[in-house]
Amino acid sequence: MNNVLDLKLKKIDKIYRPGSKVSGNVVINSKDDMSHSGVTIVVEGTVQLQLSSKSVGLFEAFYNSLKPITLMHYTISVTNGGGKFQAGITELPFEFTLEPLPNQQLYDTYHGVFVNIQYSIKCDVKRGILSKDLSKTIEFIVEVPSQNKEVLMKSTPESLITFNITPDSLVNFKKISKADVPTFKISGGLVSAICNINEAFQGHMIIESADTVIKSVELQLVRVETCGCADGYAREVTEIQNIQIADGDIWRNFKIPLYMVFPRLFTCISTAGKTFKIEFEVNLVIMLEDGHLITENFPIKLIR
């Protein structure tokens, strides 16, 4: 059996908030006595930005603003210098406070396409010249509470949204000639455009009338990632998930519930930094049998 290095956090879900204590153990499992030159832990939080292939080369001014942003970085010495671990399992405790670097702030953990916010703990066990160093890295999750005023906004009547979709209300219809557009009327409502990320997106829709057969109804969650600076920016919209709400020709005047859970890691609270921004939108997509596609867009704000 080779020497095995592992990192174990005391919280099983590995979810922490700014200012909280992060504690755990460095676990070393060795077959024989093992000499070392020291055990260190490096805690790091970074924002990684990148441009899409269509934007590369168009925005030379972006490259300086696209450098990784270090939110937190500190090194912890787990042992006082070198020594020897006895054969078997050795556990070394560690603890640190989750705090950002000066003039920085912590953001939600987020795995996007052009923006990534990650927090990691890396442990290194230094050994002699003739022995191989041991290294182990794990990721932990940071959840940042929203400001109180944002939470209060969620319960105000102004946050309720009603909508009516007709051929005249559509901005971008999939066919140029409106004479070819079938007659339809779709109404509904959303509980709120300000959504708690730990709760489901909810609402309803009603097909009041439609001259053509409806094929299906889908609810699409998209991310809107913006990277750049004052000299210019690149805005990229990509799909996170697509949920089918109804299949086939729906009864007219039947109330259809809209319900969607926000996936962890692939969503975060709506976030804005100096050189990046993360926003979210929901698309209600109605596919007609004749090939038309009706889409209504709802920008939403995610809070915690």
From Swiss-Prot:
Signal sequence range: none
Keywords: Endosome
Pfam families: Vps26
InterPro entries for this protein: Arrestin-like_C (IPR014752), Ig_E-set (IPR014756), Vps26-related (IPR028934)
One GO cellular component term: endosome
GO biological process, one term: intracellular protein transport
Subcellular location: Endosome
Main location: other
Domain of life per record: Eukaryota
PANTHER family reported in the protein's UniProt record: VACUOLAR PROTEIN SORTING 26 RELATED
Role: Component of the commander complex that is essential for endosomal recycling of transmembrane cargos; the commander complex is composed of the CCC subcomplex and the retriever subcomplex. Component of the retriever complex, which is a heterotrimeric complex related to retromer cargo-selective complex (CSC) and essential for retromer-independent retrieval and recycling of numerous cargos such as integrin alpha-5/beta-1 (ITGA5:ITGB1). The recruitment of the retriever complex to the endosomal membrane involves CCC and WASH complexes.
Subunit composition and interactions: Component of the commander complex that is essential for endosomal recycling of transmembrane cargos; the commander complex is composed of the CCC subcomplex and the retriever subcomplex. Component of the heterotrimeric retriever complex consisting of vps26c, vps29 and vps35l; within the complex interacts with vps35l. Interacts with snx17 (via C-terminus); the interaction is direct and associates snx17 with the retriever complex. Interacts with snx31; the interaction is direct.
Family of this protein: Belongs to the VPS26 family.
Protein name as annotated: Vacuolar protein sorting-associated protein 26C
